[in-house]
């Protein structure tokens, strides 16, 4: 969701910097980049390590709650779509393609985002705090595929981050990579595109067939 469908990473920049100021420090660009696509827990660990703070669980939980409340207020002011994202979702829905939103964002904040962009696009939604292990573990994608009644290998993931791409691949799904703020390395089961505006339903079907074929050709 963040950085794939909506241009929310800039809002996360604002809230992350505000949190660090509240904690008495400054977040370096390198540390911020390392948090992109991360779970709430991993982000807090990175922030506390960056600021040299003791990673006390209660303090990190309070910081996470503050961060998500602040970010939610920014989300509710309006989330800008990334180029081509809304149009592609509408085409997929019209074509009858079931869609799952798979995000490391917590459920409470995801609901605030869905209030802004519309939840009607998605057949199912899976959030980072609803699985045992968030991305880069495969759990979120495996859960989404299960809810859709599919195997993950029957699904095509669209991701913008190293973390999300790793999660999709670990689940067995080929990936369309649309890099946003962080470069994502290439791979045999990844198709890089510069923007979702380049894609329509037939393009996605062709990419899925191509990447799935490459996976089938790999030695056991």
Task: Label the model's feature ranges.
Residues 11, 35-39, 66, 80-84, ...:
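Short beta->alpha linker loops
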């Amino acid at each position: 969701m963040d950085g794939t469908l909506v241009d929310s990473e800039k809002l996360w920049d604002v809230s992350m910097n505000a949190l660090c100021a509240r904690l008495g420090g400054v977040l370096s660009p390198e540390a911020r980049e390392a948090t992109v696509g991360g779970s709430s827990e991993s982000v807090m660990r990175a922030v506390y390590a960056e600021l040299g703070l003791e990673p006390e669980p209660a303090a990190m939980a309070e910081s996470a709650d503050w961060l998500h409340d602040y970010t939610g207020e920014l989300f509710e002011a309006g989330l800008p779509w990334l180029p081509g994202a809304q149009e592609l979702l509408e085409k997929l829905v019209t074509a009858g393609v079931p869609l799952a939103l798979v995000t490391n964002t917590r459920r409470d904040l995801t609901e605030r985002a869905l209030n802004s962009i519309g939840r009607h696009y998605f057949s199912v939604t899976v959030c980072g705090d609803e699985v045992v292990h968030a991305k880069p573990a495969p759990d979120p994608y495996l859960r989404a595929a299960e809810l859709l009644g599919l195997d993950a290998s029957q699904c095509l993931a669209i991701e913008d981050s190293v973390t999300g791409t790793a999660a999709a691949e670990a689940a067995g799904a080929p990936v369309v990579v649309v890099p946003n703020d962080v470069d994502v390395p290439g791979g045999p089961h990844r198709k890089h595109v510069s923007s979702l505006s380049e894609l329509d339903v037939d393009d996605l079907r062709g990419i899925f067939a191509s990447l799935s074929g490459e996976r089938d050709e790999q030695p056991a």
